[in-house]
Design a protein with these regions (language model features):
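Short, hydrophobic alpha-helix immediately C-terminal to the catalytic nucleophile
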Residues: 40, 107-111, 311
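Signature tryptophan residues that serve as conserved aromatic anchors
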Residues: 32, 36-39, 101, 107, ...
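Glycine-rich phosphate-binding loop signature in dinucleotide/nucleotide-binding domains
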Residues: 20-21, 89-92, 321
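Flexible "cap/lid" subdomain of the alpha/beta-hydrolase fold that forms the substrate-access gate
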Residues: 1-2, 12-13, 25, 61-97, ...
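Active-site helix-initiating loop/hinge in glycosyltransferases
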Residues: 31, 74, 305-306
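Conserved HGGG/HGGXW glycine-rich cap/lid loop of the alpha/beta-hydrolase fold
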Residues: 17-65
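Catalytic active-site module of serine/aspartate enzymes centered on a nucleophile-bearing elbow/loop
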Residues: 289-321
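A short loop-to-beta-strand scaffold at the N-terminal edge of the catalytic core in hydrolase folds
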Residues: 9-17
């Protein structure tokens, strides 16, 4: 594996890469609060299997550029960055894989540019269609009220200074975040995504939160160093563009994912509390869905918690394209 700096039309991207330069291209899109290194096991496995694997630090993260304006983090920018990355390699096709926030990016790559992204695989977050009644933050508030679990964290993240709590103690914030969504964390200590009154995404996590079993100190130090240097404003600006995304994607209302697709989620992933309802209808929205897996015992950080199973899932999907 190697770390590259690739200049695209919109920005300079830091990319973890492996595999023959002429191998079939696979782009891996991380989520929050992660980096391209969250795909290290997959980049290695794909490279060894003959694929050209690229895992960028996404816009606003790590070694990739961080625009200042909130409105520069829309889904159109994020998909555009992946289009530019593919083009920078002299390619006209790629498979896109996404996890967490990277899953909606991957789904929208396939939705908006099926000519370029010939297949899509997503982890943790199923495709969620645009709901005409939006905007999303209002629907999320209604969901919070209906479930009675407290305020939804994405609504809390809309605050212009929400990132400051993370930046005040980067190591502590990351430790709590990884712990709260990990499959090994006891049920009564894992997050639901909804915060009791008077708490935040971070303060609701127990103070004695530890690193997940799969997260070594050296690996954790990489995250801490990257987010200490970059801050988390850009990362949270992704969330602050959710309503703007809803406005910008009106032209894609009711459009389906037509390329081959695959989806995997851990059965202990807290995202299922608020997005799991979309798993049942995934085949209707992605008619060429070829594999849908619920991985027993796995939490949210599935490609790092259970790398061997995720590698087998991806390689199996790719081999049948």
């Amino acid at each position: 594996m190697e770390t590259l700096r690739i200049k695209t039309d919109g920005l300079t991207q830091q990319v973890l890469a492996a595999g023959p330069v002429d191998g079939p291209l696979v782009v891996l899109v991380h989520g929050f609060p992660e980096l391209g290194i969250s795909w290290r096991s997959q980049v290695k496995a794909l490279g060894e299997a003959g694929y050209r694997a690229l895992a960028p630090d996404m816009r606003g993260y790590g070694g990739t550029d961080r625009p200042d304006r909130r409105e520069d983090y829309t889904i159109l920018h994020l998909v555009g960055d992946m289009v530019d990355l593919v083009r920078s390699q002299g390619r006209d096709q790629a498979v896109v894989v996404g996890h967490d926030w990277g899953a909606p990016v991957a789904w929208h790559c396939a939705l908006m540019r099926p000519d370029l992204f010939r297949a899509v695989a997503a982890l943790s977050v199923p495709f969620q269609p645009r709901i005409p009644k939006g905007p999303p933050t209002l629907l999320m508030k209604a969901l919070s009220k209906r479930l009675g679990l407290g305020e939804f964290y994405i609504n809390q993240f809309q605050s212009a200074d929400a990132h400051l709590e993370f930046e005040a103690d980067v190591a502590g914030a990351l430790r709590r975040g990884f712990y709260a969504y990990d499959g090994a964390t006891p049920d009564d200590r894992r997050s639901t995504g909804f915060q009791p009154e008077g708490t935040t995404f971070l303060s609701a996590v127990p103070e004695d939160a530890t690193l997940p079993p799969w997260m070594g100190e050296d690996h954790f130090a990489e995250y801490v160093a990257a987010f200490t240097a970059s801050g988390l404003k850009g990362a949270l600006d992704w969330y602050r563009c959710i309503d703007l995304n809803w406005t910008l994607t009106a032209a894609f209302q009711d459009r389906r994912i037509e390329v081959p697709a695959a989806f995997l989620v851990g059965d202990r992933d807290p995202v299922r509390v608020y997005a799991g309802q979309h798993e049942a209808g995934l085949k209707d929205r992605a008619p060429d869905l070829r594999n849908q897996v619920v991985l027993a015992g796995a939490g949210h950080w599935v490609q790092q918690e259970r790398p061997d199973e995720v590698n087998a899932f991806l390689l199996g999907f790719l081999s049948r394209l």
